[in-house]
Structure formats: structure tokens, C-alpha cells
Amino acid sequence: MRTFWSSYASPRLTFGPGVLNEIRNVVSQVGGCRVLIITDPILESLGIVDRVKQALDAEIEVFAEGEAEPSTKAVARCAEIARAYGPDTTLAIGGGSNMDLAKLACATVSSGRDPETLLGFDEVPGPIGPL
């Protein structure tokens, strides 16, 4: 029986009411000038992505194909967009699924590996860019 767990966390996770008021500062603190926003079609259709874009002082590309259970195909499409765009910062808007998609897409780009080879414990070979 397992008796311990390890938790790996981002240096900064910002969420909650009023987070949009801080988003510009959060992105600028990590040096974000070219931002890739990863979200889903619902949040995009609600205008949330537009509000974030207006709040940022950066060049922005949007990947709005997030899914409830992100597939490795969605990760590969997102990574392809990221490689072509070359963001210095990635911003996930939404819940855990969009954050998972963003993390795996960033790991795919930084490692140069196929997303299917990154699934499992300790498979990501190193740090990824600001997320």
C-alpha cells in the first residue's frame, strides 16, 4: 500500500473572482510578450477570451479547441500551433482540462516528443516554458 504522495506545482497558479484584474501583471511578471491562450469553444463564445485579450499588453494567438477529456490528437494540434507561433508564455483559460491540455502541449513542444510518449509518471524530460 502506498504511504506517501508527491505534489508538483507551478510556481504560480492564479485563479478566483477578480483574476482578470490581475492577468496583465501576472503575464508581464513572467516576461510575456507573445502569449498563446489555450481554452475551449464555450469560454471563447462567452467572450471571456476577448476580455483577457483586451487586458493583456502582448501579441496573442488563441487555441480554442479544448475538450472535456483532452485527447492526444488535441494536444498534437495545439503543439503544432505553439511551434508555429513561438510563444514565450502560455495561458490556460478554463478548468482542469484546459490546464492539462496546456501543460501537455508545452511539454510536447519543449521535449520535441510525441504527446503519447509523455503520458505516465516522470515522462516529461525537463522544465517547460512559462505556463
Task: List the predicted regions and their residue ranges.
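ATP/NTP phosphate-donor binding region
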Residues: 1-89
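Glycine/threonine-rich beta-strand-loop-alpha-helix active-site module
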Residues: 73-131
